[in-house]
Design a protein with these regions (language model features):
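Functional-site microenvironments in short loops/helix caps that host divalent-cation chemistry
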Residues: 72, 148-149, 155-269, 279
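Extended beta-strand/loop cores of jelly-roll/beta-sandwich
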Residues: 1-177, 184-189, 261-292
């Protein structure tokens, strides 16, 4: 586990001198496995929009596995939905939809905020070709269809396929609290991409199939630069690391939601594996920040 105070929160990072930031990023790069290099930083404009200063989110590229990782700075956040938040959700969602969603909304258990240490997370869901270069996917499984023939596509894999891939590459799954923290972008946001109900039907592109499209990426990214958190992913529970969940919303309810089911974009959805056909989900690759 790293002990770098500058990574404890976005505020700490922004108050750090540029020379020290560069020193920390260089030390992280040197602590990562061979084959990593610096990637173009993501410019977060969230603070600039509320009168602050835009800041660069450091990114690292794993050439061997063709994966870009973002340095997710630590911070405190409310893990799960508070009682007040549940009341707000209940009042904002049609009763029929709420009755279906309520059993899988993750309610807050902690008395206070949970601290998430900094870690590295893939900017995109893991693509099919990356998985297939390392493990053989089981044939005969019906995997989610996508609305466009243009790729690349995020891979939907079984738990067993995911375990084999992680063992082969040295990556890990996000802990469940890490995923929810990034989905909320360090704030109390209602939806995984933004803070308002989308004003159009997302059924055609909820999985954001054209990740190579820069405009789509910018539209889908949260303030950390994370793209397409709506794609369902496996997570692990800290209290029981052998227990997996599926997080993300939207695509977690396969087939994809229609216009009247926007509530499925809720950040706090925490689904048992049985909720996905074939117990399949996507992968968001993570690494711990190296000790410096």
């Amino acid at each position: 586990m790293h002990t770098i105070p500058e990574l404890a929160s976005p505020k700490s990072w922004q108050s750090t001198l540029p020379s020290r930031r560069a020193e920390i990023c260089q030390a992280i790069l040197e602590g990562l496995p061979r084959g990593f290099e610096f990637a173009k930083p993501f410019l977060s404009t969230e603070l600039a929009e509320v009168g602050g200063t835009a800041w660069e989110v450091p990114c690292f590229y794993d050439a061997q596995h063709e994966t870009t990782l973002t340095l997710v700075l630590g911070d405190d956040f409310t893990y799960g939905a508070t009682a007040q938040r549940l009341d707000k959700l209940r009042d904002s969602i049609p009763a029929e939809d709420w009755s279906l969603i309520a059993p899988v909304v993750h309610a807050a258990q902690e008395a206070g905020p949970v601290h998430v240490p900094a870690f590295l997370m893939g900017r995109f869901p893991t693509f099919e070709w990356v998985i297939e270069e390392h493990v053989e996917l089981c044939e005969g499984l019906e995997r989610p269809d996508f609305s466009s023939e243009d790729g690349p596509f995020p891979a939907y894999v079984t738990q067993e396929e995911a375990q084999r891939f992680l063992a082969a590459t040295g990556y890990r799954l996000p802990w469940d609290h890490e995923w929810e923290y990034v989905a909320k972008a360090g704030m109390e946001r209602l939806y995984v991409c933004g803070d308002a109900v989308p004003q159009r039907d997302l059924s055609g592109d909820v999985c954001l199939t054209q990740f190579g499209d820069g405009q789509l990426n910018r539209a889908a990214a949260n303030p950390w630069g994370m793209v397409a958190l709506a794609v369902a992913t496996f997570t692990r529970l800290q209290a029981s690391p052998h227990e997996w969940r599926i997080r993300g919303g939207a695509a977690a309810f396969y087939p994809f939601q229609h216009r009247m089911q926007q509530a499925m974009l809720l950040t706090e959805l925490q689904l048992p594996l049985a909720n996905m056909p074939g117990q399949m989900a996507g992968l968001r690759l993570c690494l711990d920040v190296p000790a410096i």
